[in-house]
Amino acid sequence: MSLEDDVIAIIVEQLGVDPKEVNENSSFIEDLNADSLDLTELIMTLEEKFAFEISEEDAEKLRTVGDVFTYIKKRQAEQ
């Protein structure tokens, strides 16, 4: 599985959405109907999966699925 597939699988599981609804441009709040608790749980799951901490400041910037793809790729390149 690619990074994108892994992230989408986590989003689908955590938010209970249809995989067809999830794409790079999907907004967590507007398109996927996530609330703040959903987003907190999603961030925690991403941290566990990819083995790094996401600061609260960085987490607030992750508004779309594409933002998460970009952030994780950047963090992996830094490791």
Curated annotation (Swiss-Prot):
The modification O-(pantetheine 4'-phosphoryl)serine is found at S36. Transmembrane segments: none annotated. It comes from the Bacteria. GO terms for cellular component: cytosol; membrane. Keywords: Cytoplasm, Fatty acid biosynthesis, Fatty acid metabolism, Lipid biosynthesis, Lipid metabolism, Phosphopantetheine, Phosphoprotein. It is found in: Cytoplasm. Residues 1-76 form the Carrier domain. GO terms for biological process: lipid A biosynthetic process. Belongs to the acyl carrier protein (ACP) family. This is Acyl carrier protein. It comes from Chlamydia pneumoniae. The lineage of its organism: Bacteria, Pseudomonadati, Chlamydiota, Chlamydiia, Chlamydiales. The gene is acpP.
